[in-house]
Amino acid sequence: MTVLCVVGPTASGKTKMAVALARQLNGEVVSVDSMQIYRGMTIGTAAPTAAEMEGVPHHMIAVADPAEQWSAARFCQAADACIQDILSRGKLPVLAGGTGLYLDALIRGDDFAPGCQGGRTRLRLQQELWELGPREMLRRLEAVDPETAARLHLRDEKRILRALEVYEETGEPMSRRDKRGREKPDRYQALYIGLNFRDRADLRERIDRRVDEMVRRGLLQEVQALLAGGLPRDATALQAIGYKQFLAVADGTATAEQAVEEVKLRSRQYAKRQLTWLRRNPAIHWIYWDKEPDFPAALQNATDFLTAHGLG
């Protein structure tokens, strides 16, 4: 089963390329973005508008209440159902997104452990984290899964809790499960188109322009609407880049100017982490916008690659 993945850092033009390729290849787009799933959060997540979708069906956008907390497992189960539906209708799933963890899990067909829906074990571990701190939780993980613990830092609180949860629910270290998962064939045969810039300054400029556009379109008003709708201030959705900073503006603890600069900084840092993740994948065919004369040329570059690999 073949899928097409359009990947790249934030603000790299994934939506436009994914839509263009979906139109050419009789495809439908599946968003692989951990925040675009939430309703009422289109501006800050840069979810595609109806005009940007150009009539191409999109999935996994605005499907969840922002008060809900979606685990990687829940996301992948829902996205996989979308992929299977698209394939059953003879169309090509075009996966577009920047949440690398979710994309990798989807392609591999990860066998998620019990408890990953946010059950009693997770809630208890979260309470212990609040009471004891990340250092103690990481120490616990070192005792039962030293291989996973060695890859994590104190700030990786969610991953520490996830690894502890897997061990407590299954009696098996996450590192062993991961190793077994790497040994089995991937669920999907994936072709990857990656979008980026050779000159980092160009990507930084794109990110800054996108943030300015979000503010112009009403990011602050979007945050205020979420709060007015009863969304708790500590909801996971409001911890996302953009929302966290403008929540402070809504609360009067920061100015809009301070929030804008913070969002730009955090977005650049996020883009760097995305690229670090993506560069581990040698299968990605990279297209650099600053090396292509225009969008049609970049699209042709992508099409030529896909045709050479039997898609097109």
Question: Where are the model-predicted features located?
Answer:
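Phosphate/pyrophosphate-binding catalytic cores of soluble transferases and nucleic-acid-acting enzymes
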Residues: M1-G312
